Amino acid sequence: MLARYFRNLYQRTMSEAYGLAIDTISGSLEQEGNVLDCGAHNGKMFATLSEKNGINKERYFGIEWDQGLVKEATEKGLNVIQGDLNKGLPYPDEEFKCVFALSLLEHLINPCRYLKECYRVLQDDGLLVILTPNISTYFTAFLILLGKMPSSGPQPDSDTLIKKEEIFKVSSESLQPDTESDTPIHRHFIVFSYRVLRDYLESIGFNEVKGYGFGLYPFPNFLQPLLEKIDPYHCHQMVFVAYKSKSNSK
């Protein structure tokens, strides 16, 4: 019963967070300009964006670590390349109108370097959209008081330990830990707090940085919309929308 309760909380949280992020990305593409999908998987976001605002393949670019997923994307005719986002973005300055990373930042070893690269490749008045978990939650504090590790990460390089520490499995049953592989896709390395991520985005030149919180656990779903507005700082997931201003361009 309790596991189902938290699973419902999680599913609602992710649905709302992704919904806002996708609507924001889609809205930014109503004007001319290209979009960069970081952690593009097999290009699945292209279908969503194309359906929402009719973006064509020529405006969609993606970068993905997994070569098999890159192959799937290119077979669809999408411009998705293989690359390691810890090592910079292989694109020229001011190339994109919008750059987005959904559930990606926590998987990087060098997330601050990555965010600087996002700033570099964005056009003036370009938009960055980030969706990532928040380490500074009441639920995390509760786990630490119990002597356990934060469920949001960082995570150790042991699948057995991660499964042992997991109180409830709220994600899909098909999503299994892969931390012991040579190329872990699901492992969380660095997890920001709401205030730290907001302040860092501002420090590297972004302005109009707006953050949103989703999922203030353990409160029930019917209270979430109100609580998320009152206290976005301690929600389970956070979405940040940030503009590269002409006046702040470095």
Label the model's feature ranges.
Residues 57, 77, 125, 205-208:
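A generic structural signal for alpha->beta connector loops
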Residues 103-107:
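A short His-aromatic
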Residues 17, 120-123:
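Short, cationic motifs built from Arg/Lys/His that form the positively charged side of catalytic pockets
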Residues 73-75, 91-93, 140-143, 153:
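Short, conserved acidic/polar surface loops in the N-terminal third of protein domains
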Residues 109-117, 127-245:
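S-adenosyl-L-methionine-dependent methyltransferase catalytic module, highlighting the catalytic core
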